[in-house]
Regions:
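Hydrophobic alpha-helical segments
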Residues: 1-180
């Protein structure tokens, strides 16, 4: 992880001192710029409802036990309409426990788990998502999921440490051991 002050002046905005992910990813500044452009699109321009998008990204962090991804998106999710009940439902859905989530949210979570743990989405889930979201939102959801699955792989490979201020989210919503 690079100290922001040691970076050339033009790269400092890429790696705020309080962001471990960007202080790590800035080792490849051109790649980080493109990564940030994609994540900006996902957050600010995608037509996927923010609650569903964030539930998918939280699911990725949860199912991979990537506390960095999980806690950062809990914070973003809570600001985007994800409730504490939704967060508990993500854990329950992962364990195969019935929840009161609406069918579309369940399909988003299942598709996210299938992509994260495998390589594709089952036909029935894909059909549900296509029917409920339409082609554009479905494609944007898939862009979001595969982008953040890649992010998790980088975070885990590079062992990016969680900033202390995010520990509270992990304490409130711990990652349970995944049932097989």
């Amino acid at each position: 992880m690079i100290e922001t002050a040691s970076l050339p002046e033009d790269q400092r905005p890429l790696a705020p001192p309080d962001s471990h992910i960007f202080r790590t990813f800035v080792n490849a500044p051109a790649g980080l710029r493109r990564y940030r452009a994609m994540t900006k699109f996902i957050r600010e321009e995608s037509h996927v409802p923010p609650r569903l998008r964030e539930m998918a990204l939280i699911q990725i962090g949860y199912v991979t036990s990537c506390v960095y991804e999980y806690t950062h998106h809990i914070k973003t999710g809570l600001a985007s309409g994800v409730s504490a009940d939704d967060l508990r439902a993500i854990a329950d859905e992962t364990d195969g426990i019935e929840t009161s989530l609406e069918p579309l949210a369940k399909a988003v979570l299942r598709a996210t788990r299938e992509i994260t743990l495998g390589f594709d989405v089952s036909a029935d889930v894909f059909a549900t998502l296509q029917r409920e979201l339409g082609d554009e939102q479905l494609m944007e959801l898939l862009f979001s999921v595969v982008t953040y699955v890649g992010t998790v792989k980088l975070l885990l490979t590079l062992r990016v440490e969680l900033e202390e201020r995010y520990q509270t989210y992990l304490q409130q919503f711990p990652i349970r051991p995944i049932r097989s």
